[in-house]
């Protein structure tokens, strides 16, 4: 939507300066193969569907009432699955909302917060929105995070692990190095993709009072359409997040989302099976693309980051779209020759590979 300068006179000065996050395309055309926003190619657990139907058919009258502001049942399910105390769990309307509360709760300090120069592009948006000072730390020549760069003075650290869009993961030992180097500020590990092969930092929670781990049900649990995210930390940090939440939106998760997420956490076998299917498909996709001449960064996510020395990435993305396949292209320095490709089903991945082989390369 185009807004004139005259119309912008009603906007606050801060909003006029905002550079909002640009979400991945959600196409209106139904027959496109969508490999651009890292959604799970498989449906959620059948128990999730049953739980949502039960809310509609057995608790319809309760829809006139507000949901549990604390989402107690969901916190209990997460705590049980993660083997932690309920007081160490915070939930929100997707991990993006949880991250926003994290920025507000912990990062308004005199020193800049640190995060990689190539990472989740919501971080600079939140920093601008909340007036947080920032310092972007360059990835090394292999697009890896060098944890030694995070030992300088700062007002907080946030790292996506595995990183996005590069898909490369840090080890737990490397995460501990960051925590030990920053005992007086909060270190946030954003684990949106951790269930596809990386090591979770949740196991470190009780050892580090400055650690916050943020996760989501959107990727590995196939619940992107319901918006459920959560943070895990020691209770004194959770209390700060609860204070921010209750100053912003006391009822962030609706009854359907609570019921669905609880059911997902209770079906661990289905969760593990689907994650393994994605991992297996990812490894095959990497092999197939490598045979076509792509260089693929080592992935621990449900997507890959790939470049081809003989073909411009932007043109490849456009040609794929013309063939009905959408991937994510970032026209940004250092990564403007890479494509981020969501791992689909084996059939979807085969279509991508065959299209590249027969019609494009």
Curated annotation (Swiss-Prot):
Q: Which Pfam families does the record match to this protein?
A: Aminotran_1_2
Q: What is this protein called?
A: Histidinol-phosphate aminotransferase
Q: How does it assemble?
A: Homodimer.
Which GO MF terms are attached to this record?
histidinol-phosphate transaminase activity; pyridoxal phosphate binding
EC numbers on record: 2.6.1.9
Q: What's the source species for this entry? A: Acinetobacter baumannii (strain SDF)
Which principal EC class is assigned to this enzyme? transferase
- Describe the reaction catalysed, as an equation: L-histidinol phosphate + 2-oxoglutarate = 3-(imidazol-4-yl)-2-oxopropyl phosphate + L-glutamate
InterPro entries (UniProt xref): Aminotransferase_I/II_large, HisP_aminotrans, HistidinolP_aminotransfase, PyrdxlP-dep_Trfase, PyrdxlP-dep_Trfase_major, PyrdxlP-dep_Trfase_small
Which cysteine pairs are covalently linked by disulfides here?
none
């Amino acid at each position: 939507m185009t807004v004139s300068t005259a119309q912008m006179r009603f906007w606050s000065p801060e909003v006029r300066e905002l550079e909002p996050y640009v979400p991945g395309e959600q196409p209106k055309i139904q027959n496109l193969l969508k490999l651009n926003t890292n959604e799970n190619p498989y449906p959620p657990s059948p128990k999730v569907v049953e739980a949502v139907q039960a809310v509609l058919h057995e608790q319809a009258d309760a829809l006139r009432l507000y949901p549990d502001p604390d989402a107690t049942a969901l916190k209990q399910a997460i705590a049980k699955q993660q083997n932690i105390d309920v007081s160490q769990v915070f939930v929100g309307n997707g991990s993006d909302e949880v991250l926003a509360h994290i920025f507000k709760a912990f990062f308004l300090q005199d020193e800049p917060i640190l995060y990689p120069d190539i990472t989740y592009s919501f971080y600079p948006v939140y920093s601008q929105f909340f007036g947080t000072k920032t310092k972007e730390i360059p990835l090394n020549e292999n697009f890896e995070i060098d944890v030694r760069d995070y030992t300088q003075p700062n007002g907080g650290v946030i790292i996506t692990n595995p990183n996005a869009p590069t898909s490369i993961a840090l080890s737990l030992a490397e995460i501990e190095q960051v925590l030990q180097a920053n005992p007086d500020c909060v270190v946030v590990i954003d684990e949106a993709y951790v269930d596809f092969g990386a090591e979770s930092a949740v196991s470190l929670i009780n050892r580090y009072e400055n650690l916050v781990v943020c996760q989501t049900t959107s990727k590995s649990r196939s619940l992107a359409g319901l918006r459920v995210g959560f943070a895990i930390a020691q209770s004194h940090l959770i209390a700060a997040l609860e204070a921010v939440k209750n100053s912003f939106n006391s009822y962030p998760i609706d009854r359907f989302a609570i019921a669905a997420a609880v059911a997902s956490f209770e079906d661990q076998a289905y969760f593990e099976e689907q994650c393994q299917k994605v991992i297996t498909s990812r490894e095959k996709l990497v092999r197939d693309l490598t045979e076509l001449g792509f260089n693929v960064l080592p992935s621990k996510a449900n997507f890959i980051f790939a470049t081809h020395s003989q073909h411009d990435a932007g043109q490849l993305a456009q040609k794929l779209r013309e063939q009905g396949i959408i991937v994510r292209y970032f026209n940004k320095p250092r990564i403007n020759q890479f494509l981020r490709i969501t791992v689909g089903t084996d059939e979807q991945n085969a279509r991508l590979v065959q299209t590249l082989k027969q019609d494009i390369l």
